[in-house]
């Protein structure tokens, strides 16, 4: 991918602007499903270091992932809990919520309300997301869906 900025530089945007850009992406695309926001904010050749198997690279992979979440979880939305930025990097701790009423990861709809805890790191260059890393509590999600047993005495988020 070619960008004008190197790691540590964000193409003239400061940390506050980078955080606002990521908030816009979360509100307008992840929650709002606005395709224009996706194209405006995410570089076409974004590198997703956490891309699941079978998902396309680049912006198309971002679209595939969120189309899948929206198909599986009605009312899908993101709530930002914490956000910090330094230079061209923005870290966001957030929770996705929704009702499981479509198949997800081979699990038939359960009708359960779920919470998916996520930590994202994104790199911004020239006003666009160019790189992404994340940690998703997939284990907790699968326990909420009943696909995995809940360890004795444990209560997963969303339960």
Q: Positions of the model-derived regions?
A:
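C-terminal and inter-domain tail/linker signature
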Residues: 1-159
């Amino acid at each position: 991918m070619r960008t004008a900025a190197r790691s540590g530089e964000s193409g003239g945007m400061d940390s506050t602007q980078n955080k606002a850009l990521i908030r816009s992406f979360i509100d307008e695309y992840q929650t709002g499903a606005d395709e224009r926001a996706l194209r405006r904010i995410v570089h076409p050749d974004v590198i997703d270091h956490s891309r699941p198997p079978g998902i396309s690279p680049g912006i198309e992979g971002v679209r595939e992932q969120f189309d899948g979440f929206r198909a599986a979880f009605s009312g899908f939305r993101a709530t930002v809990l914490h956000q910090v930025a330094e230079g061209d990097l923005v870290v966001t701790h957030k929770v996705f919520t929704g009702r499981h009423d479509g198949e997800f990861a081979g699990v038939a709809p359960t009708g359960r309300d779920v919470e998916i805890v996520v930590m994202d790191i994104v790199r911004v260059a020239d006003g666009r997301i160019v790189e992404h890393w994340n940690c998703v509590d997939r284990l907790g999600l699968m326990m909420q869906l009943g696909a995995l047993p809940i360890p004795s005495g444990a209560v997963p988020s969303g339960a």
